[in-house]
């Protein structure tokens, strides 16, 4: 039971620092990840290609805090299956906040190619010369050569003996991207404010559970010192009547935007959980600007709806049922709508007139921003569930953005 409670209380994986290990087969990536965590997480073997799919582990690492460690397959894997493994390793870059490039110093050609990919993706990295326990002495010329050719800092490590691990942790802490302390509600709420959270019971959520954006918003408001009051759509009137003064902010599920907007006191700000997630994970200004593309859609247009979750859809699913129905009601039944889930996302988006993405609560910010940049680079408008719904209901100009 304690383990289950732990899972409910720990930081969501999407909010953790993502650290990925890259390197050729048998340079000791799995041994290093086990040494860093102090646990036997990754399978270690002398057989090349032991790690096939990326191995992911969430844990706390001082002084870094909550992290996700990702052990990848060797990027020198060969053959048809090896090529697939290498492609999966390449995909990991999209969600990586910091990379560790592991080498044994015997060859650097492939490491150079991969550090170029990391630089192109703007991912900070540190090189690790592993297995130094097999050397009588680590030549400074070897470290200098690795640093020169890979273009970054190099740390000599023995995953077996634990040498250099403290220095590696300190170096990783220095490389953490400086995003400042991000508040989910931004400047929409401050200490002492009363905030009303309108939360219809979501059939997608497990029994007895709230969906992640609701949990994160509640925690954000508590951290700020706000007074948070929760209600369902049916209890909005009673909740407002119970307050001496109108709430400074109302956060609602996007699906009932119009209902809440009609009941909102004049002095209260209005936003949605999806809009908050759009600003937290993506580019909210780009999403608002892109929503105007909805007005240009015709029955010959093509729309892609992207959902981060991979849950089995239920009736009245917002991405698969409600938004498509709203779009076709406005544009016409001929509108083509494609749906993708999880990490499935087309490389070529140019055949689409609009991308509508969920709040991405299951993705880390870097992964979501990578999708935003992909859309922007290909000239394809991209918006968010909450922004799209507000635009379709004609109330986007009344929604407050964080």
Name each model feature, range by range.
Residues 57-65, 70, 80-154, 183-187, ...:
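Conserved C-terminal guanine-recognition region of P-loop GTPase G domains, centered on the G4
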Residues 49, 73, 104-106, 130-134, ...:
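Short, ordered loop/turn segments at secondary-structure junctions
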Residues 2-83, 87, 91-94:
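Conserved G1/Walker A P-loop phosphate-binding module
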Residues 193-402:
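P-loop NTP-binding site
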Residues 37, 73-74, 104-105, 255, ...:
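Short glycine-/small-residue-rich Rossmann-like dinucleotide-binding loops
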Residues 28, 135-138, 142, 158-178, ...:
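Conserved GTPase G-domain signal focused on the G5
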Residues 21, 101, 127-129, 197, ...:
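Structural beta-sheet core signal
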Residues 42-46, 177-185:
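Active-site phosphate-binding and catalytic loops of NTP-dependent enzymes
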């Amino acid at each position: 039971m304690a383990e289950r409670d732990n899972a409910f209380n720990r930081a969501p994986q999407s909010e953790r620092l993502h650290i990925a290990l890259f390197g050729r087969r048998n340079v000791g990536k799995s041994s290093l990840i086990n040494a860093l965590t102090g646990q036997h997480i990754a399978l270690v073997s002398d057989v090349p290609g032991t790690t096939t799919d990326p191995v992911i582990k969430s844990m706390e690492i001082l002084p870094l805090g909550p992290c996700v460690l990702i052990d990848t397959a060797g990027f020198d894997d060969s053959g048809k299956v090896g090529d697939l493994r290498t492609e999966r390793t390449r995909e990991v870059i999209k969600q990586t906040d910091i990379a560790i490039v592991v080498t044994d110093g015997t060859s650097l050609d492939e490491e150079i190619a991969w550090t170029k990919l990391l630089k192109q993706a703007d991912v900070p990295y540190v090189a690790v010369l592993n297995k130094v326990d097999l050397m009588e002495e680590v030549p400074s010329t070897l470290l200098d050569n690795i640093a020169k050719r890979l273009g970054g800092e190099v740390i000599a490590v023995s995953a077996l003996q634990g040498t250099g691990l403290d220095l590696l942790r300190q170096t990783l802490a220095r490389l953490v991207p400086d995003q400042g302390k991000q508040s989910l509600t931004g400047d929409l709420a401050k200490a002492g404010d009363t905030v009303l959270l309108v939360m219809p019971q979501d059939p997608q959520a497990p029994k007895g559970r709230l969906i992640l954006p609701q949990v994160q918003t509640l925690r954000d408001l508590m951290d700020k010192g706000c007074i948070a009051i929760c209600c369902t759509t049916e209890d909005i009137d009673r909740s407002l009547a119970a307050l001496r003064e109108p709430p400074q902010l109302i956060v609602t599920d996007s699906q009932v935007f119009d209902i809440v907007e009609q009941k909102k006191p004049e002095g209260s700000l209005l936003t949605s959980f999806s809009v908050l997630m759009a600003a937290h994970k993506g580019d909210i200004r780009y999403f608002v600007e892109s929503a105007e593309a909805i007005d240009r859609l015709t029955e010959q247009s093509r729309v892609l709806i992207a959902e981060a979750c991979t849950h089995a859809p239920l009736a009245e699913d917002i991405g698969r049922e409600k938004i498509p129905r709203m779009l076709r009601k406005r544009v016409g039944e001929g509108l083509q709508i494609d749906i993708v889930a999880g990490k499935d996302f087309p490389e070529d988006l140019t055949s689409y007139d609009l991308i509508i993405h969920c709040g991405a609560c299951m993705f880390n910010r870097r992964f979501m921003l990578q999708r935003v940049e992909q859309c922007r680079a290909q000239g394809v408008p991209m918006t968010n569930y909450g922004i799209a719904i507000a635009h379709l209901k004609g109330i986007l100009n009344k929604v407050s953005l964080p």
